[in-house]
């Protein structure tokens, strides 16, 4: 997980923590897909970090990604040491999802709740870029 947050370059990173079993997470996934398409070819990476259980990777996560034709980069976090990596994401995060972090070399924004719409996400990204 740490390498995702240690990038110091001219790229903007949009990192969303989600799971297939989290209804609010699934509801906001189209916003990240839209952002991924909108900024294709630009210096932006959209990374969807799944917190799905390891036992569900093949039966639920892989199938979900394929059925929903997710184009954003999907990573799986299997580290069960939650207290350690939650603090690395943001000290104010209690561990509930969905959560999004948008950062560049100069700025960082933590969104500790479900996004209302695509425009909210794009507004945060515009402020960070």
Pin down the residues of each PLM region.
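Short pre-active-site segment immediately N-terminal to redox-active cysteine/selenocysteine motifs
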Residues: 11-13, 18-21, 53
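Thiol-/selenol-based redox modules, centered on thioredoxin-like
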Residues: 97-129
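Short, internal strand/loop/helix patches
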Residues: 64-97, 105
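A short beta-strand-turn-helix
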Residues: 1-13, 36
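Loop/turn elements at helix/coil->beta-strand transitions in domains of secreted/extracellular proteins
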Residues: 8-13, 42-45, 70-73, 105
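Conserved redox-active cysteine motifs that mediate thiol-disulfide chemistry
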Residues: 17-34
């Amino acid at each position: 997980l740490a390498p995702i947050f240690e990038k110091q370059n001219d790229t903007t990173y949009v990192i969303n923590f989600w799971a297939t079993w989290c209804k609010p997470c699934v509801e906001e996934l189209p916003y990240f897909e839209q952002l991924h398409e909108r900024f294709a070819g630009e210096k932006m990476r959209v990374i969807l970090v799944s917190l799905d259980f390891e036992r569900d990777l093949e039966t639920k996560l892989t199938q979900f990604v394929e059925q929903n034709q997710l184009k954003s980069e999907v990573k799986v976090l299997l580290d069960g040491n939650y207290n350690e990596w939650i603090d690395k994401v943001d000290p104010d995060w209690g561990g509930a999802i969905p959560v999004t972090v948008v950062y560049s070399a100069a700025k960082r924004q933590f969104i500790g709740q479900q996004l209302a719409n695509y425009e909210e996400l794009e507004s945060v990204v515009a402020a960070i870029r």
